[in-house]
């Protein structure tokens, strides 16, 4: 039985990179999410910027509450990145084998990334919904994962799934841009690499830079849908006193109309700067860590090949 070591290495390195970057940037993610979700309240604006969210936590002596839902977010992040990178690597390898091409084009890459993203969204949507509800609850009043998911019916755990599927275009755009830039950056190094040695890898700074550029482009193009998804998922976790109001906010059209009515067209981009700051740093860190882990994985595969006598055809170049 052939083990798809290439897909496994990609999935593992991507998941570990996501876990580390999510933990480092989680307080920023909490502030961003609470700021974006404020559209669910009518009337006065509570937060003018991210600093107001941070100051609220400090003034209420709830700084540690900036980490509420971290365990759920890490679990969701690890699983989603593992599924995504495994699916992306597997579909990409399958495409190259079936088509006979030596490289993958931009259009095919976009489709493959979207397919991997769709699988990821379906598999991790309940965890994504739970983490959003936990983050947007009042500081110090966040509930556990099971209690959060069991408050409503099972369908509530999949709030925002349709938008999550739409947002598969975000990582699709991101990784398409990143891969194309990466291929160009490594072209000369790969041509000069000796056979049997580890393929050239990006430097930490270059991986960070390319990750930031690719994620910025993807975020700007998909942000209205991102904010709409946050509002839909956060509706159940705050004001539970009015079920009718919450119910009316669970459709995409009602949320889009509500933003337009209260904030105008610029409301669709409220918090864009915060989203870019968080996602660019997160994705850049993820890809930077992934590149380093992938390079180390190659060394491990060579060791397995030599000492465990794995057949040559079963070990794929990473």
From Swiss-Prot:
It is a multi-pass membrane protein. The chain crosses the membrane at residues 8-28, 104-124, 158-178, 201-221, 252-272, 284-304. Solcar repeats lie at residues 5-94, 104-184, 202-296. Pfam families: Mito_carr. Induction: Down-regulated upon illumination in seedlings germinated in the dark. One of its GO terms (cellular component) is peroxisome. GO terms for biological process: ADP transport; ATP transport; fatty acid beta-oxidation; peroxisome organization; seedling development. The keyword Transmembrane applies. Its main location: membrane. InterPro entries: Mit_carrier (IPR002067), Mitochondrial_sb/sol_carrier (IPR018108), Mt_carrier_dom_sf (IPR023395), Peroxisomal_Ade_carrier (IPR045900). Keywords: Antiport, Membrane, Peroxisome, Repeat, Transmembrane, Transmembrane helix, Transport. The keyword Iron-sulfur does not apply. Coiled coil: none annotated. SUPFAM superfamilies: Mitochondrial carrier. It is found in: Peroxisome membrane. GO terms for molecular function: ADP transmembrane transporter activity; antiporter activity; ATP transmembrane transporter activity. Belongs to the mitochondrial carrier (TC 2.A.29) family. Peroxisomal adenine nucleotide transporter catalyzing the counterexchange of ATP with AMP. ATP is needed by reactions that generate acyl-CoA for peroxisomal fatty acid beta-oxidation during postgerminative growth. Required for the conversion of seed-reserved triacylglycerols into sucrose that is necessary for growth before the onset of photosynthesis. This is Peroxisomal adenine nucleotide carrier 1. The lineage of its organism: Eukaryota, Viridiplantae, Streptophyta, Embryophyta, Tracheophyta. The gene is PNC1.
């Amino acid at each position: 039985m052939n083990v798809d070591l290439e897909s496994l290495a990609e999935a593992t390195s991507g998941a570990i990179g996501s876990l580390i970057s999510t933990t480092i940037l989680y307080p920023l993610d909490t502030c961003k999410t609470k700021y974006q979700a404020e559209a669910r309240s009518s009337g006065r604006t509570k937060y003018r910027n991210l600093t107001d969210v941070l100051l609220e936590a400090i003034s209420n002596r709830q700084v540690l509450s900036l980490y509420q839902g971290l365990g759920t977010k890490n679990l969701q992040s690890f699983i989603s990145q593992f599924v995504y990178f495994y699916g992306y690597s597997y579909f990409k390898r399958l495409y190259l084998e079936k088509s006979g091409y030596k490289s993958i084009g931009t259009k095919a890459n976009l489709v493959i990334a979207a397919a991997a993203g769709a699988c990821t969204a379906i598999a991790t949507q309940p965890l994504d919904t739970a983490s959003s509800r936990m983050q947007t609850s009042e500081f110090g009043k966040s509930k556990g994962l099971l209690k959060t998911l069991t408050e409503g019916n099972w369908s509530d755990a999949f709030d925002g799934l349709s938008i999550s599927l739409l947002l598969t275009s975000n990582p699709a755009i991101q990784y398409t841009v990143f891969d194309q830039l990466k291929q160009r950056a490594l072209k000369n190094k790969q041509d000069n690499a000796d056979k049997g040695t580890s393929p050239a890898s990006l430097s930490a700074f270059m991986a960070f830079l390319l990750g930031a550029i690719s994620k910025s482009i993807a975020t700007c193009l998909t942000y209205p849908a991102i904010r709409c998804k946050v509002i839909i998922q956060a509706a159940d976790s705050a004001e539970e006193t009015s079920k009718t109001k919450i119910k009316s906010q669970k459709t995409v059209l009602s949320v889009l109309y509500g933003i337009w009515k209260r904030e105008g067209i610029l409301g669709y981009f409220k918090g864009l700067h915060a989203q870019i700051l968080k996602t660019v740093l997160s994705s850049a860190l993820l890809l930077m860590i992934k590149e380093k882990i992938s390079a180390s994985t190659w060394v491990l595969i060579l060791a397995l090949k030599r000492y465990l006598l794995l057949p040559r055809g079963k070990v794929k170049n990473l």
